[in-house]
Amino acid sequence: MAEETQHNKLAAAKKKLKEYWQKNRPRVPAGVNRNRKTNGSIPETATSGGCQPPGDSATGFHREGPTSSATLKDLESPCQERAVVLDSTSVKISRLKNTIKSLKQQKKQVEHQLEEEKKANNERQKAERELEVQIQTLIIQKEELNTDLYHMERSLRYFEEESKDLAVRLQHSLQCKGELERALSAVIATEKKKANQLSSCSKAHTEWELEQSLQDQALLKAQLTQLKESFQQLQLERDECAEHIEGERARWHQRMSKMLQEICTLKKEKQQDMRRVEELERSLSKLKNQMAEPLPPEPPAVPSEVELQHLRKELERVAGELQSQVKNNQHISLLNRRQEERIREQEERLRKQEERLQEQHEKLRQLAKPQSVFEELNNENKSTLQLEQQVKELQEKLGEEHLEAASQQNQQLTAQLNLMALPGEGHGGEHLDSEGEEAPQPMPSVPEDLESREAMSSFMDHLKEKADLSELVKKQELRFIQYWQERCHQKIHHLLSEPGGRAKDAALGGGHHQAGAQGGDEGEAAGAAADGIAAYSNYNNGHRKFLAAAHNSADEPGPGAPAPQELGAADKHGDLREVTLTSSAQGEAREDPLLDKPTAQPIVQDHQEHPGLGSNCCVPLFCWAWLPRRRR
């Protein structure tokens, strides 16, 4: 509204100036010349500001001489005309002064508007600087995300190399298992020889063997307690990993919400800038229209010519400033468009990252399904404890009862063991892993009187059934290993062949290290891998010691040799291939030659550089050991 009023005032002032110069320019010089011709004293009276008094004029005329009344009338008429002209000129001069004052006021108003526009421009520049700072922060966050992805790729490579080493170790463990089976067969042969020799032994010798079998069962109980503790540790570590994953997911959601808020604020500021630019363009168009109007010719004898020139110069200067502001606004609009494009790209990237995180969460849920097997294993361990109690009761009764009662009890025991040995045949491939962790089998009870042929035949049949059961369990273990290997291979292949992900955003082994983690996640994963190597070396040392003990027992059979069921149970516990990743590794594990491999050295170095990391991670080694060797 203020600009329109100024524009109207300028137009009215210009019209008044035109009318004034059109009216007064041709008349004023003619009147002046005529007055000069008639009487030379009239300009003096005009400059003095009034006409001569009648008395003076009369006296002047009397000095010259007597004149007629007609000449007096002729002289009075031009004086009156001159007085009227002087009055009109004074009125016009006052009007011109008023117009000059109004122009000065308009000039002040224009200057005030220019100051306000300068302030608005300064505010816009401040907003632009803030936008640039926000863009720089977004770029820094983008670089941080790229570094996190690079660290995840590096840890993925380490895990792939470690999986290769673990596959080699798996082959070594399978070889150890074959050697143990041979030792077990040798022990079974020795037991058969012992059974033949026991026909001539006394009852005291059998009681001594029963005592040793009880001791062996106590050892098996200790092993079961250790397995239970390991299961509990695995469950605790699994819960810690789940909490870690949830914390990372919450942090990513917070980052996404902050980014969305910043984008909304940037959009609002952009809209405000666009409105300001439109207002400036409107004001510029109005000023251009004012400049385009033709100016009236300047009067030669007006005293306000200098002020009008000054006003013109100021108007030209204002027009130049407005043009520069228009150029700046155009540049700002271009920058805003580029910023909008960058913000859209960042929104798309963030949306893709959200989709990837959701996919990873779904994959983690799918990979967490096999962990339900641990509950089944706990139930089976409870059932094995009950069986051990039953075996104890049966062995206490064997010393007092007859051969027939002992054979009947052995048949019942074999039936119960058959039921426990094959719990998952009708439930598909998901329950096959529970058969690999079967309860330790008790030593077969030896009857008191082996002199009869029927007792010997029943005892041999019992041993054959035990051997058949052990072979069947081994076959099922192999089937479970193949099934789990194929399943892991499919999942890892799906994660690695994912479009756009390229194994960057997918964490190997159940997603324990996700993409939103900080730089310490790489050291944490390396420490977990180093602890896993140490624990697995302990496992290999235990296998070697057990193998040496089995060979010694096969070469030197004696009354203190372990029963075949003990070795079978130990073999089954050895085939669990599941180790808790604790930092309390023994000295024998530290001296394992497998740590000298090139793939294990960088992991151990990262673990030494970042102590304390990896103590809370949980990665079951049986999952990593059965991963396929993926060639690049």
From Swiss-Prot:
Coiled-coil regions, chain positions: 86-148, 270-411
UniProt protein name: Golgin subfamily A member 8Q
Compositional bias ranges of the Gly residues kind: 508-520
Keyword terms, alphabetized: Coiled coil
Family membership noted in the UniProt record: Belongs to the GOLGA8 family.
Cysteine pairs bridged by disulfides in the record: none
Source organism: Homo sapiens (Human)
Biased composition (Polar residues): 38-50
Domain of life: Eukaryota
Gene, per the UniProt record: GOLGA8Q
Region (Disordered): 1-72, 423-445, 504-524, 552-573
GO biological process: Golgi organization
Alphabetized Pfam families for the sequence: GM130_C, GOLGA2L5
Keyword Coiled coil among record annotations: yes
InterPro entries given in the database record: GM130_C, GOLGA_cons_dom, Golgin_A
GO CC term, one of those recorded: cis-Golgi network
Keyword presence, Nucleus: no
